[in-house]
């Protein structure tokens, strides 16, 4: 999964667009409290959408083959993230649970969390985020299978429209043996939910 290629506007163009949005809300972008808002928003957006400048596959490039014979399920759970809905550009706040069955090589645990962060720092749908995480791990590590579950609250449902605060959306995707073997799916979900293997 490569870095997306875009024709990125200049910082001055971004700041001008924010001034326009401030005027559109009915406020005055020249008042004291808003004078620096366009610059602050541009800086915040660069941070919140920094995933476009990173390649998640590169994070998985360094693997370890000497793991004392371990070849069973590896799960990194409760990876908290913030993303933004591609439809309304409002926050998605949630946590990801990522598991894989190694096939001779493992990756540092922090790299799994880093992959989640890179994709989360792009405009997203939860469904796409779930599939992207699983896809890059499957493509780069080539494990026997990958399982990803995401639980998230969408501010586009909480702050606008239907206004249902606290509702959570669950998505999951499975590759390899997880896709082919329902018992492996159950084992993953049971371990994520706090049960034994």
UniProtKB/Swiss-Prot annotation:
Keywords: GTP-binding, Hydrolase, Metal-binding, Nucleotide-binding, One-carbon metabolism, Zinc
Residue positions binding Zn(2+): 85, 88, 156
Disulfide bonds: none
Gene Ontology BP, a term: tetrahydrobiopterin biosynthetic process
Record field: catalytic activity: GTP + H2O = 7,8-dihydroneopterin 3'-triphosphate + formate + H(+)
E.C. number: 3.5.4.16
Pathway membership, UniProt: Cofactor biosynthesis; 7,8-dihydroneopterin triphosphate biosynthesis; 7,8-dihydroneopterin triphosphate from GTP: step 1/1
Keyword Chaperone: no
Subunit structure: Toroid-shaped homodecamer, composed of two pentamers of five dimers.
Descriptive protein name: GTP cyclohydrolase 1
